[in-house]
Amino acid sequence: MKNTSALAETAALWAAVRFTADGLVPVIAQQHDSGEVLMMAWMNREALEETLVTGKACYWSRSRGRLWRKGESSGQTQKVLALRLDCDGDTILLLVDQTGVACHTGRRSCFFNEVGPTGEITVVSAPLVTPEALYGAEGHSHP
């Protein structure tokens, strides 16, 4: 999904996206060919613009207060093949080609905790790689 900066400046897009009072919009990343839901993150206008221009997922890290270019420290990138808005314009769906794992815990998906009928939580997927292997000896805090 490589786009020109002209697309990022499209008035229709900015009118359609409903950012929160904090200037953010929730984003779901989904593997384009399998339908697997990989993660949920946030974008601000700058992150959305960068994603559109580069074709690579860029999010807003609320904990760090800065842009988070997916894979910049781990190499686990997301190539954006399509971007969709929901019917209200308040959630974005990215159809991506995920390189490696999406979760900072080393799992393919961030959705690895399954909640049972009585509220018990079962971990349904093991890490494919350690956070230390992804981010170095210091590990990684949640984006």
Swiss-Prot record:
**Cofactor: how and how many bound:** Binds 1 Mg(2+) ion per subunit. Binds 1 zinc ion per subunit.
**Major localisation:** cytoplasm
Q: Which UniProt keywords apply?
A: Amino-acid biosynthesis, Cytoplasm, Histidine biosynthesis, Hydrolase, Magnesium, Metal-binding, Zinc
Superkingdom of this protein's organism: Bacteria
Q: What is its EC number?
A: 3.5.4.19
Under the heading InterPro entries, the entry gives: PRA-CH (IPR026660), PRib_AMP_CycHydrolase_dom (IPR002496), PRib_AMP_CycHydrolase_sf (IPR038019)
GO BP of this protein: L-histidine biosynthetic process
Which GO terms of the cellular component aspect does the record hold?
A: cytoplasm
GO MF terms, alphabetically ordered: magnesium ion binding; phosphoribosyl-AMP cyclohydrolase activity; zinc ion binding
Record family assignment: Belongs to the PRA-CH family.
State the oligomer form and interacting partners. Homodimer.
**Record protein name field:** Phosphoribosyl-AMP cyclohydrolase
